[in-house]
Amino acid sequence: MQKQIYDTVIIGAGASGLMAAVTAARKGLRVLVLEHMEQAAKKILATGNGKCNYTNADQSLENYYCEEPDFIRTVLAQFSCQDTIRFFEELGIRPVQKNGTCMYPESGQASSVK
């Protein structure tokens, strides 16, 4: 068996782990994602009632509970709703806005995000 060399190992194939893996791979890194469950991204399939509400256009501070509001401001300034939409569009997943602020894949199926 040939030994594999990776630049980055990501533990967990949930939404954050998979986004981190895509981001690292885009930078040219060799990435390994480890997941202990049988299926990667299983929780993604349940979001948005099976349609994958992957971001929300209303990112007002009052929508977040945190003892440090500056932390939320910093996070949202670093990766906004528009950044999330762009990330998925680059993967070929076009957004549709429903219920005023919720963003879903145009396909209407969470499996298209997985």
For the regions a protein language model found, what residue spans apply to each?
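Short glycine-/small-residue-rich flexible loop motifs, especially phosphate/cofactor-binding loops
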Residues: 21, 73, 85-86
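Glycine-rich FAD pyrophosphate-binding loop
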Residues: 9, 25-49
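N-terminal glycine-rich dinucleotide-binding loop that anchors FAD/FMN and/or NAD(P) in oxidoreductases
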Residues: 45-78
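General structural feature for long, well-ordered alpha-helical segments within catalytic domains
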Residues: 20, 29, 36, 112-113
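Short, contiguous strand/loop micro-motifs
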Residues: 7-8, 70-74, 103-104
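Beta1/beta-strand and adjacent pyrophosphate-binding region of the FAD-binding site
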Residues: 2-16, 32
